[in-house]
Structures are given as structure tokens and as C-alpha cells.
Curated annotation (Swiss-Prot):
Name of the featured protein: Co-chaperonin GroES
Highest taxon in the source lineage: Bacteria
GO molecular function, one term: unfolded protein binding
An annotated GO cellular component: cytoplasm
Protein's job: Together with the chaperonin GroEL, plays an essential role in assisting protein folding. The GroEL-GroES system forms a nano-cage that allows encapsulation of the non-native substrate proteins and provides a physical environment optimized to promote and accelerate protein folding. GroES binds to the apical surface of the GroEL ring, thereby capping the opening of the GroEL channel.
Xref: InterPro entries: Chaperonin_GroES (IPR020818), Chaperonin_GroES_sf (IPR037124), Chaprnonin_Cpn10_CS (IPR018369), GroES-like_sf (IPR011032)
Subunit and interaction comment: Heptamer of 7 subunits arranged in a ring. Interacts with the chaperonin GroEL.
Keyword Chaperone: yes
Species of origin: Glaesserella parasuis serovar 5 (strain SH0165) (Haemophilus parasuis)
Amino acid sequence: MKIRPLHDKVILKREEIETKSAGGIVLTGSAATKSTRGTVIAVGNGRTLDNGTVLPLNVKVGDVVIFNEYGVKEEKIDGETVLILSEDNILAIVE
């Protein structure tokens, strides 16, 4: 299934993080935190301003970003979990 976000929405695939501690202990539950980094897999056409102008997004497909977990929608697409969020929830692009 192909998915296309609307307006200022961005779709990410969350980066996997290490589930073992430095000592080799497998972390589970609250000790195994979710990553707040992800790879952009789709972007909307931009934010519509009050005057009708469409402002393009700053992120593009393939960018690795750091995002705020608040306001993120998890969705299963073809058995794969993706994250849908507004560009406002993206804090930085990792270069």
C-alpha cells in the first residue's frame, strides 16, 4: 500500500535502538526506551498559510530526524509500523 501524507504531515520509520546494555544484559519493559530518531519515508506538500500560500517542508524523503514523541500517531501499513507527525514535532535533521 502506498501512503501519501497531507499538508505538513511527515511519515517516519523509527530507528531501532540497542536492546542490550553495555554489559550485555537484554533490556525489556521500561528499561528499553523507544528511539526518537527516524528516517523520513514520505512528506506532505507543505503548510498552507492564512493567505493561501503553500510553504514547502524543510525535511525530505531519506532525512534522518530527531522528533518529539508528543503528538505522534503510530500506524501499521502493510505489517510495518510507521509514525505520522506534523513537521512541527521534528526537532532536528541529523547530518
